[in-house]
Amino acid sequence: MKKNLEATIEEIVTKITDEHGFEMVDVEYVKEAGEYYLRVYIDKEEGISLNECELVSRELSPILDEKDPIKENYFLEVSSPGLDRALKKDRDFVRYQGRDVDLKLYKPLNGCKQFEGELVGLTEDNNIKIIANGKEMEFNRKDVAIVRLAIKF
């Protein structure tokens, strides 16, 4: 149910973001502290502004009210994915090749669940490839809990 709902919302959001030259990055529908939140993450090549997030929110809200895909009361949040954005879609792994990433596994590999390195990209088998400590490593996507852009100070 949740995946179908998120896919429906993604379709609606994508129509709006495409119209403005933005990218629909992700949609999350979560319950936190007894409240429901619909979080929509958008971006563009040079970064998304607060005004652009507000624009999408104002256009999205009446469409969601009309189509009513969510039966519960919820809060709508539209924002950028942040500096440490999660990489989820194939295009993310292409766009951020060469960038440093933090990769976390569901289960330890050789006693380690966290890896940091340079993103090489996706293999033909759809595995994630990074260079960590000068060594090329490949991870099956189903074993990876999350990949985020690393923030370096």
Curated annotation (Swiss-Prot):
Membrane in keyword set: no
The keyword Ribosomal protein belongs to this UniProt entry's keyword annotation: no
Locations listed in the record: Cytoplasm
Top-level division of the source organism's lineage: Bacteria
InterPro entries listed in its UniProt record: Ribosome_maturation_RimP (IPR003728), RimP_C (IPR028998), RimP_C_sf (IPR036847), RimP_N (IPR028989), RimP_N_sf (IPR035956)
GO biological process: ribosomal small subunit assembly; translation
Principal cellular location given in the protein's record: cytoplasm
Keyword terms of this UniProt record: Cytoplasm, Ribosome biogenesis
Record Pfam families: DUF150_C (PF17384), RimP_N (PF02576)
Gene Ontology CC annotations of this record: cytosol
HAMAP family: RimP (MF_01077)
Family, as annotated: Belongs to the RimP family.
Cited function: Required for maturation of 30S ribosomal subunits.
Full protein name: Ribosome maturation factor RimP
Organism of provenance: Clostridioides difficile (strain 630)
Classification of source organism: Bacteria, Bacillati, Bacillota, Clostridia, Peptostreptococcales
Gene symbol of the encoding locus: rimP
